Amino acid sequence: MTFEAKYLGSNGWLIKFDKTNLIIDPWLTGDLIFPPGEWFFKGSLDNEILIEEDINIILLTQGLPDHCHVPSLKKFKKNIDIICPNSAKGILEKLGFTSIKVLKPKEKIMQKDLEIEATAGAPVPQIENGYIVKDDKGKGFYIEPH
Protein backbone atom coordinates (compact mmCIF):
# COMPACT_ATOMS: atom_id res chain seq x y z
CA MET A 1 0.00 0.00 0.00
CA THR A 2 1.24 3.43 -0.91
CA PHE A 3 0.51 6.03 1.70
CA GLU A 4 2.36 9.32 1.78
CA ALA A 5 1.52 12.39 3.81
CA LYS A 6 3.20 15.70 3.00
CA TYR A 7 2.65 18.68 5.29
CA LEU A 8 1.94 21.84 3.31
CA GLY A 9 1.91 24.31 6.19
CA SER A 10 -0.89 25.86 8.21
CA ASN A 11 -3.65 23.19 8.10
CA GLY A 12 -2.75 21.78 4.68
CA TRP A 13 -1.78 18.23 3.78
CA LEU A 14 -1.23 16.33 0.54
CA ILE A 15 -2.16 12.66 1.03
CA LYS A 16 -1.27 10.04 -1.57
CA PHE A 17 -2.85 6.57 -1.64
CA ASP A 18 -2.31 3.91 -4.33
CA LYS A 19 -5.10 5.20 -6.58
CA THR A 20 -6.17 8.54 -5.14
CA ASN A 21 -4.52 11.81 -4.15
CA LEU A 22 -6.30 14.21 -1.86
CA ILE A 23 -5.46 17.62 -0.53
CA ILE A 24 -6.71 18.83 2.83
CA ASP A 25 -7.34 22.50 3.71
CA PRO A 26 -4.95 23.89 1.08
CA TRP A 27 -3.25 27.27 1.48
CA LEU A 28 -1.03 27.34 -1.59
CA THR A 29 -0.90 30.94 -2.74
CA GLY A 30 -1.56 34.50 -1.63
CA ASP A 31 -2.11 35.91 1.81
CA LEU A 32 -4.29 34.42 4.51
CA ILE A 33 -6.52 37.14 5.96
CA PHE A 34 -9.19 36.64 8.59
CA PRO A 35 -12.19 38.96 8.70
CA PRO A 36 -12.61 41.72 9.63
CA GLY A 37 -9.28 42.53 7.94
CA GLU A 38 -5.50 42.50 7.87
CA TRP A 39 -5.27 44.35 11.18
CA PHE A 40 -6.83 41.29 12.88
CA PHE A 41 -4.80 38.53 11.20
CA LYS A 42 -2.67 38.32 8.08
CA GLY A 43 -0.37 35.46 7.15
CA SER A 44 1.89 35.43 4.12
CA LEU A 45 3.62 32.62 2.28
CA ASP A 46 7.29 33.04 1.45
CA ASN A 47 6.70 31.17 -1.83
CA GLU A 48 3.71 29.74 -3.66
CA ILE A 49 3.33 26.00 -3.04
CA LEU A 50 3.22 24.05 -6.30
CA ILE A 51 1.38 20.73 -6.42
CA GLU A 52 2.68 18.48 -9.19
CA GLU A 53 0.43 15.51 -8.43
CA ASP A 54 -3.02 15.12 -9.94
CA ILE A 55 -5.45 15.84 -7.11
CA ASN A 56 -8.65 13.76 -7.11
CA ILE A 57 -10.35 15.07 -3.96
CA ILE A 58 -10.26 18.26 -1.91
CA LEU A 59 -11.14 17.63 1.74
CA LEU A 60 -12.07 20.71 3.78
CA THR A 61 -12.49 20.58 7.55
CA GLN A 62 -13.99 24.06 7.98
CA GLY A 63 -15.34 27.05 6.10
CA LEU A 64 -12.90 29.50 7.73
CA PRO A 65 -10.16 31.10 5.59
CA ASP A 66 -7.31 28.98 7.01
CA HIS A 67 -9.14 25.83 5.86
CA CYS A 68 -11.19 27.07 2.89
CA HIS A 69 -8.69 29.50 1.33
CA VAL A 70 -10.33 31.11 -1.68
CA PRO A 71 -7.18 32.12 -3.67
CA SER A 72 -5.84 28.55 -3.34
CA LEU A 73 -9.14 26.90 -4.23
CA LYS A 74 -9.30 28.99 -7.42
CA LYS A 75 -6.29 26.99 -8.70
CA PHE A 76 -8.31 23.76 -8.96
CA LYS A 77 -10.63 22.52 -11.72
CA LYS A 78 -14.26 23.39 -11.04
CA ASN A 79 -15.38 19.76 -11.39
CA ILE A 80 -13.00 18.32 -8.77
CA ASP A 81 -14.67 16.32 -6.02
CA ILE A 82 -14.85 18.33 -2.79
CA ILE A 83 -15.97 17.01 0.58
CA CYS A 84 -16.68 19.63 3.21
CA PRO A 85 -18.84 20.79 6.11
CA ASN A 86 -21.87 22.96 5.39
CA SER A 87 -19.92 26.08 6.41
CA ALA A 88 -17.78 25.78 3.24
CA LYS A 89 -20.57 25.01 0.77
CA GLY A 90 -21.62 28.58 -0.05
CA ILE A 91 -18.02 29.68 -0.59
CA LEU A 92 -17.41 26.79 -2.97
CA GLU A 93 -20.63 27.43 -4.89
CA LYS A 94 -19.67 31.10 -5.37
CA LEU A 95 -16.35 29.91 -6.82
CA GLY A 96 -18.23 27.75 -9.34
CA PHE A 97 -17.38 24.27 -8.04
CA THR A 98 -19.84 21.64 -9.24
CA SER A 99 -19.02 18.45 -7.30
CA ILE A 100 -19.53 19.42 -3.64
CA LYS A 101 -20.48 16.81 -1.07
CA VAL A 102 -21.46 18.17 2.36
CA LEU A 103 -20.95 15.77 5.26
CA LYS A 104 -22.12 16.12 8.84
CA PRO A 105 -20.48 14.25 11.73
CA LYS A 106 -21.23 10.49 11.57
CA GLU A 107 -22.01 10.59 7.83
CA LYS A 108 -19.91 8.51 5.40
CA ILE A 109 -19.30 8.64 1.68
CA MET A 110 -17.40 6.50 -0.83
CA GLN A 111 -15.33 8.75 -3.07
CA LYS A 112 -13.05 7.16 -5.66
CA ASP A 113 -11.55 4.21 -3.71
CA LEU A 114 -11.77 5.94 -0.32
CA GLU A 115 -14.33 5.77 2.46
CA ILE A 116 -14.58 9.16 4.16
CA GLU A 117 -16.42 9.52 7.44
CA ALA A 118 -17.02 12.91 9.03
CA THR A 119 -16.45 13.24 12.77
CA ALA A 120 -17.21 16.12 15.11
CA GLY A 121 -14.58 18.80 14.76
CA ALA A 122 -13.93 22.15 16.36
CA PRO A 123 -16.90 24.25 17.56
CA VAL A 124 -16.00 27.58 15.86
CA PRO A 125 -18.87 28.47 16.57
CA GLN A 126 -20.80 25.61 14.89
CA ILE A 127 -19.37 22.09 14.92
CA GLU A 128 -17.01 21.67 11.98
CA ASN A 129 -15.55 18.38 10.67
CA GLY A 130 -12.78 15.97 11.36
CA TYR A 131 -12.49 12.92 9.10
CA ILE A 132 -11.60 9.25 9.13
CA VAL A 133 -10.29 8.31 5.68
CA LYS A 134 -9.71 4.68 4.65
CA ASP A 135 -8.72 3.11 1.35
CA ASP A 136 -10.27 -0.05 -0.10
CA LYS A 137 -7.88 -2.15 2.03
CA GLY A 138 -8.97 -0.49 5.28
CA LYS A 139 -5.75 1.52 5.71
CA GLY A 140 -6.03 5.20 6.45
CA PHE A 141 -5.84 8.09 8.87
CA TYR A 142 -7.80 10.49 11.06
CA ILE A 143 -7.58 14.27 10.85
CA GLU A 144 -9.02 17.08 12.91
CA PRO A 145 -6.87 20.20 12.74
CA HIS A 146 -7.27 21.40 16.31
Residue ranges and their predicted role:
Residues 2-4, 76-82, 139-141:
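Short active-site oxyanion
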Residues 8-18, 110-146:
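Catalytic core of the metallo-beta-lactamase
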Residues 9-10, 85-91, 104-107:
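Short, polar loop motifs at secondary-structure junctions
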Residues 20, 78-81, 97:
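A short helix->loop->beta-strand "cap" motif at the edges of active sites that frequently abuts
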Residues 20-59, 71-75:
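Pre-active-site segment of Zn-dependent metallo-hydrolases
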Residues 24-25, 54-68, 83-86, 141-146:
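Active-site neighborhood of phospho(di)ester-bond hydrolases with catalytic His/Asp-centered motifs
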Residues 31, 63-68, 89-91, 107-110, ...:
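Active-site environment of divalent metal-dependent phosphoester hydrolases
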Residues 92-102:
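Helix-loop-beta element that forms the nucleotide-linked donor phosphate-binding surface
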